[in-house]
Amino acid sequence: MKKIASSAKQFVICVKNDGYAVSLEKRKIYAALADATAARHGLMRVVDESGEDYLYPKKFFVPVALPFSARRAVMKAA
């Protein structure tokens, strides 16, 4: 599986996965990558179950602030 790039500045929790049940698990933490163009279209670039980043509807996720130790552990586990 691909390591999460250090450019992953935000973590999000999946709250909806309609049509993407294979790629996204509800209640799971994912890394979100900055993508201004996607954001303008209501999308978010997320590293999904495949280990690759794809665009998903922004409404599928809520941002989460992780303590530094948790953030480091999540990035290391990816």
Residue ranges of each PLM-predicted region?
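C-terminal structural segments of small proteins and small subunits
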Residues: 55-78
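Conserved functional hotspots at enzyme active or ligand-binding sites that engage polyanionic ligands
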Residues: 1-3, 47-49, 78
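Basic/aromatic-rich interaction segments and small domains that mediate binding to polyanionic partners
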Residues: 13-25, 29-56
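SH3-family beta-barrel domains
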Residues: 1-16
